[in-house]
């Protein structure tokens, strides 16, 4: 597999950090609205549109630029590494959020790329653990769709 096991986790974490910075420092301002009474709030619909646009950008850039020469098997195995990291650190942050709150924030920065998935599941009022399982397990495998059927490396 030519040492490709790290590519999906590294790409997704780097993309997540960039998405987080864009949301907090730039794009999030678009979702801030002033209500008729003068109070300031965030518009959930705008935030979801912004998150969906970032998700699509991350998937398209990853799929068409970074993973297009990898086989589907390589991408699948690399995505499995990210799933394991999601589950291990997701459970860790859930259990230890009061003890290590800064790690919880740090981990959320590194998993921001697919936040639209958990936002949509929240809108569906799914059970908290079912939502977490879906959000942790499924999104990394979307990149498999962009892989080649056979090894093109020679």
Each PLM stretch: what is its role?
Residues 1-52:
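Transmembrane alpha-helical insertion/packing segments
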Residues 11-23, 77-101:
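Hydrophobic alpha-helical membrane-insertion segments
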Residues 18-30, 58, 62-66, 88, ...:
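Alpha-helical membrane-inserting segments
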Residues 29-46, 90-130:
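Interfacial non-cytosolic loop connecting adjacent transmembrane helices
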Residues 47-74:
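Canonical alpha-helical transmembrane segments
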Residues 49-56, 117-141:
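Hydrophobic alpha-helical transmembrane segments
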Residues 67, 134-154:
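Cytosolic juxtamembrane helix at the C-terminal end of the final transmembrane segment
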Residues 70-79, 126-130:
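Membrane-interfacial entry segments at the cytosolic side of transmembrane helices
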